[in-house]
């Protein structure tokens, strides 16, 4: 488990009571059942859904429907938003995988239940975005309400996406600069395939996640803060820019790969053309030498004192004539 997420309370990673002023206090697993929230307070619980005790708490003590629990605990999810009625909703998001040995595009699922005064989030693998939110709360500059907890989580998830896509674009810039600086330089095809696969993996989850932000900007739940829509619209715009950047990255990679393919094809064509010219040049001379060397009724000119030099002169004449013909035909 990552150092930035270390829960040892039977699946509860973080428990926090928000005081409505950007800060709050931590709560342990045993305190949850006896909490008595003040009117301005909200509760945020962050769980490791891979721990059986966390799953048991969700089903037995969270007060959620079986349908909601099944969705929160299912194995395979895609980013989506579900209105559960009664002023509550489920939000399924994805974050960049920064765990050791993992591929960043293998995005980590974050499942969130939220209502007016409570947010329950679950993950299987650690997410740095959650730790960033906790740091804000510890510093007294974090979310003040349940709706802001959901927004802060989405905001920090999007920050990681921004950084990752900028890194991909920078790597591609370096490849393009290398190719432009030296016409003979070949781009690293393995690197291009990796960048293309990474871009496709990110796009798979970011496109539906952008739609979630757009939906949340239009939601009119009573516990949403008045300016929430503006913040969700900004996140929607950021993800839209990221998706456009991913599309541009894909096009740039395609251009590099097509240019390299054309370069290889042209080099092969030049090589084949050169081999064809060489073959065409020496074929008549090979015919003459083969004809002179045929051992039927004796070798022509074998008894002549200058036979060898005459044969060389004949071959030289054929070569000169061929060179003249090739030049006239612009083959050389």
UniProtKB/Swiss-Prot annotation:
**Where in the cell?**
Cell inner membrane
- Segments on the Periplasmic side according to the record's topology features: 287-307
Keyword entries, A-Z: Cadmium, Cell inner membrane, Cell membrane, Cobalt, Cobalt transport, Ion transport, Membrane, Nickel, Nickel transport, Transmembrane, Transmembrane helix, Transport, Zinc, Zinc transport
Where does the record place a coiled coil? none
Cytoplasmic compartment residues: 1-277, 324-332
> How does the record classify its membrane topology?
Multi-pass membrane protein
- Which is an annotated Pfam family here? CorA
Name of the protein in its database record = Divalent cation transporter CmaX
Q: What is the lineage of its organism?
A: Bacteria, Pseudomonadati, Pseudomonadota, Gammaproteobacteria, Pseudomonadales
Q: Which reaction does it catalyse?
A: Zn(2+)(in) = Zn(2+)(out); Cd(2+)(in) = Cd(2+)(out); Ni(2+)(in) = Ni(2+)(out); Co(2+)(in) = Co(2+)(out)
Transmembrane regions listed in the UniProt entry: 278-286, 308-323
Of which family is this protein a member? Belongs to the CorA metal ion transporter (MIT) (TC 1.A.35) family.
What are this entry's molecular-function GO terms?
metal ion transmembrane transporter activity
Its function, per the record, reads: Transports divalent cations including Zn(2+), Cd(2+), Ni(2+) and Co(2+). The proton gradient has a small influence on transport suggesting that the transport is probably not proton-dependent.
Q: Does the keyword Transmembrane helix apply?
A: yes
Q: Name one GO biological process term.
A: cobalt ion transport
- Record note on quaternary structure: Homopentamer.
Q: Which InterPro entries match?
A: CorA_cytoplasmic_dom, CorA_TM1_TM2, MgTranspt_CorA/ZnTranspt_ZntB
User: Is Kinase there in the keyword field?
Assistant: no
A GO cellular component annotation in the UniProt record: plasma membrane
